[in-house]
Structures are given as C-alpha cells and as structure tokens.
C-alpha cells in the first residue's frame, strides 16, 4: 500500500520546526519507526497518491488525492486539517469521496469501474475547487470535471450524474481533455485551462465558472490557441481584477 502522510512546518525565529508529532511502532519494540515522520492523512487499503494541498482558511488546509481503496480504478478523496492536524468535523479519518464509482459504504454502483485521476485544488475561505480527469463518459478518452467543497460539505454544487459522488463537466468535447490547471478569479469563481485533443492536434482552451458552478463562457470553453501543430502545458493565474492570464 502507498499512503499519504503530512507534516506542518513552523518557524521559531531562528530555524524551521516540525509542528506535528506521531509515534509509529510497527515492530512492538517501543521505538518510533519514523521519527519526525508527520501524521497519517490517508492510510486506507490500496494506494493513495497524486496528492495536492493548499491553504483554505486561517483554520484549515485542504488536501486532495487519488485513492484506490476500492480497487485499481481510482477515485478522488479529500479532507480538511486544522493547525493541529485534526480533520474537520464533517470529514472522517481517511477523508471523504469527491467523485467515486462507489457509495459511502464502498458498494460498487455499476458493473464497470470508472477511473478518476490527477486531482488539483485551489481554495479560499468560501470553498475549495477540485478538478480531475474523468473517464466515466462514453468515449472514455478523458474529460475534465470540477466540484466545489467546503470543510462542512464534500459536494457543494448540484450534480446530474448517476453517481452519488461526482462533479460537473468543465468539458465533455469529443477527444481527450488533459493537463488541466486552475486559478481563483477573486470573486468566488474559478478559471480552468487545459489541453484539448481533437483532430489529432492539441490546442489550449479556457473556461470560467462562477461561485455557483455556472459557466460564463461557451459550454466547452473558449479557444486560447489553435495554431497548427500542438499547443501544450497551459498555466493560468488570476490578474487581480477578476480576469486571468
């Protein structure tokens, strides 16, 4: 199994200090096997990987990851930790699903398992926005989905999915959408950019969603560059005035 651990770093005026302590004695010999090893964040069965973390508020940070606790087809999970490393009240140990092919008890919802991969997260005190690559749709080539969560709710935006835990589509165009990035707009919304693979060529597209998950652009986003050959590796940053670079 591959698990996720975390450590909070502080500064005492002269040096970096480790704020979180845990004792892990796997051998029963009274000796800490991982001194200064941080605290467990996700240690469920299976692999937990592709983790991302960001500041949420003065009270919490938010962590998201790719989770295979229900098998080799990964889901996306998240948790909120306070300054002591304690999860928010609404989030149990090992987090809650953001998108999953299973219900809260781990019961598979479909005969086929679908993959949800490579989460990313940006946040402010109003909520955290999580994007991921989603392989639930019919062409299975990979689309981009998003969900807004808070320390009290692991799915703020309403969904029309057959899944219990899911998000809303950023893009469901034919072909693959990948290598997505996001940034906050400063007004409660979010910008998302990605590589759009269509007609054997990669272009760059962008989409803006407001705080309620409504798109202010075309349903599948706006084209940033569709010149001949491939355009790859997009990045996006807010401009401080509600727009983005």
Describe the predicted segments one by one.
Residues 1-245:
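Extracellular, repeat-based ectodomains that mediate carbohydrate processing or recognition
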